[in-house]
């Protein structure tokens, strides 16, 4: 298969025949270069190098060294007047309207890094000042009182570490990983994000730790929240509701941000990718390969 081909495919045909002769296997197709906005691989993203410009609403994502599933926050970056900045040092944090703590491949190691970098102290100071704090998966675990690892699933030599103490919960790592699709309706949410009550959410969980005092989708209140659900901001109305809260606190109009359906946009982008792939590949041949008929 030839991927991301630019130009007239007819010009490429002689080369495809030569390739088949040299390799002794058929070319399954040619997929043209197409601009499709889909989620990046964690290690291949260009988002981390983007501008640190602060816009009408400013959101800071803490860029921990072992960051994962950072695309949880993509719904926020598709508003023209919202800046989503990835921050890995205190001097770049400033005073954002919301701080997001992402998932991580190692909660304990990245929690230690937060302490050593001074970012934990900066986050605690921001939380004390009323800034909205939201952690997802590993970032959620960091917000609790303790993270324990009695079986040393994550790190050898570490059985327990203090969390930030912003949420009334404790996390314990176990050998079996939680992997599940989840959906539901927000209820019982208190504090700044109480407007989420009644909205539907869906996503997935994939994590090693279990947290006591955990609500189904959203824990916390006041101005600090956390969730194990990846994709929690994608469903219609959720990102909008959070941004409306931030706008009201800042005294600016939500209309200046422009409404955006993240879930619908993502579906349209994947549909576009599927159409391009189907149009470029010999799909009957691909299916025969999948069924081991070739």
Label every PLM stretch briefly.
Residues 100:
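N-terminal Rossmann-like NAD(P) cofactor-binding module of classical short-chain dehydrogenase/reductase
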Residues 1-85, 90-97, 166, 170-171, ...:
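C-terminal lobe/tail of nucleotide-utilizing enzymes
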């Amino acid at each position: 298969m030839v991927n991301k081909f630019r130009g007239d495919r007819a010009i490429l045909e002689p080369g495809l025949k030569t390739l088949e002769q040299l390799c002794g296997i058929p070319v399954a197709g040619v997929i043209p270069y197409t601009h499709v906005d889909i989620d990046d691989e964690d290690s291949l993203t260009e988002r981390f190098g983007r501008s640190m410009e602060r816009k009408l609403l400013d959101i800071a994502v803490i860029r921990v060294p072992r960051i994962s599933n950072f695309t949880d926050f993509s719904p926020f970056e598709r508003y023209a007047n919202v800046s989503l900045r990835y921050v890995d040092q205190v001097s770049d944090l400033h005073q954002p309207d919301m701080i997001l703590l992402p998932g991580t491949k190692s909660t304990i190691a990245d929690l230690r890094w937060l302490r050593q970098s001074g970012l934990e102290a900066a986050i605690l100071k921001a939380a004390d000042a009323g800034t909205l704090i939201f952690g997802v998966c590993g970032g959620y675990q960091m917000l609790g009182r303790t993270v324990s690892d009695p079986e040393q699933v994550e790190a050898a030599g570490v059985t327990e570490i203090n969390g930030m103490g912003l949420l009334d919960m404790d996390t314990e790592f176990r050998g079996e990983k939680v992997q599940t699709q989840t959906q539901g309706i927000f209820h019982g949410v208190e504090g700044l994000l109480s407007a989420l009550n009644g909205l539907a959410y869906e996503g997935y969980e994939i994590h090693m730790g279990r947290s006591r005092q955990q609500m189904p989708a959203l824990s916390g209140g006041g101005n600090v929240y956390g969730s194990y659900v990846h994709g929690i901001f994608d469903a219609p109305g959720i990102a909008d509701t959070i941004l409306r809260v931030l706008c009201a606190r800042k005294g600016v109009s939500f209309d200046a941000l422009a409404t955006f359906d993240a879930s619908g946009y993502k579906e349209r982008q994947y549909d576009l990718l599927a159409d391009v792939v189907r149009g470029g590949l010999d799909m009957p041949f691909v299916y025969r390969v999948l069924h081991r008929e070739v």
